[in-house]
């Protein structure tokens, strides 16, 4: 069995990764457990375990609760997870926001330098969503239509001058603000609450995001995230 760990900054990212994995792989070939870090302690949030002999992948997702702690939380646990519990890959996912766009390469290099100091550096990966994970949501331009059939791409363009089909969502300074504006058209307040995050993440077309070359070229950070997952899944 291949063990893969994810460290994410919050519940929206955690729910997105859970749903992405469940759409990307065939059940019952995997098991997923999500954990919320509470200081030095942790608490299980969701568990999708099974005892099928077909299980090939075991995923553990840590909801760190803060973008600044994603990498440090991974590094604090990496040695034990890799050497004792035999995790093949640990991936850290966080938003570039609130940092400025021009700091992107600086942050990536800083994290990779920290990883390179470790003997198990080849088992670590860092993904920076530009500017926020909501840019990945916006790339699925029919997402909002699935949430409410008033919210077609043309309707959104006419009302807000946001062209979901043509725009590069990674160029938005605040993708989350775009999501908030779009949902406000149907009187939905986007506050990243758990129920709301589930509703959004369960309406995303993950096959479209993963396998459309046009979309992959728009959201390069997501393309890299999927690449890291694929490398982990096919490690043996």
Regions found by a protein language model. Give the residues of each.
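Extreme N-terminal starter segment of soluble prokaryotic enzymes
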Residues: 1-5
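Catalytic nucleophile-elbow at a beta strand-turn-alpha helix junction centered on a G-D-S/GDSL motif
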Residues: 6-15
